[in-house]
Curated annotation (Swiss-Prot):
InterPro entries referenced in this protein's UniProt entry, alphabetically: Plectin_eS10_N, Ribosomal_eS10, WH-like_DNA-bd_sf, WH_DNA-bd_sf
Protein name: Small ribosomal subunit protein eS10B
GO biological process, one term: positive regulation of protein kinase activity
Subunit structure: Component of the small ribosomal subunit (SSU). Mature yeast ribosomes consist of a small (40S) and a large (60S) subunit. The 40S small subunit contains 1 molecule of ribosomal RNA (18S rRNA) and 33 different proteins (encoded by 57 genes). The large 60S subunit contains 3 rRNA molecules (25S, 5.8S and 5S rRNA) and 46 different proteins (encoded by 81 genes). eS10 interacts with GCN1 (via middle region); this interaction is direct and promotes GCN2 kinase activity.
PTM characteristics: The N-terminus is not modified.
Primary localisation category: cytoplasm
Note from the entry: Present with 7650 molecules/cell in log phase SD medium. There are 2 genes for eS10 in yeast.
Length: 105
């Protein structure tokens, strides 16, 4: 599907930033809930990444759930010209500073 490159870049940037995208199965929806673009563009762009093996798709209750794979991280890092130390949000583990470290036996 032909779509403007700016729209594709928005989708790819959001996917890399978050690591996960949720899209409602509504092709006529004017705008995606989180990305400032058409919902159809989001579904089709991520469908393309799924066919290349960069994204894993799960469908449940009229919603598509897209998760980024290891190959997808490398592809988007190259596509968006990002350095190695930048990783998706799903790869970052937040640690509660008040919580003590777990003891290993």
């Amino acid at each position: 599907m032909l779509m403007p490159k700016q729209e594709r870049n928005k989708i790819h940037q959001y996917l890399f930033q978050e690591g996960v995208v949720v899209a409602k199965k509504d092709f006529n929806q004017a705008k995606h809930e989180e990305i400032d673009t058409k919902n159809l563009y989001v579904i089709k762009a991520l469908q393309s990444l799924t066919s290349k093996g960069y994204v894993k798709t799960q469908f449940s209750w009229q919603y598509y759930y897209y998760t980024l794979t290891e190959e997808g991280v490398e592809y988007l890092r190259e596509y968006l010209n990002l350095p190695e130390h930048i990783v998706p949000g799903t790869y970052i583990q937040e640690r509660n500073p008040s919580q003590r470290p777990q003891r290993r036996y």
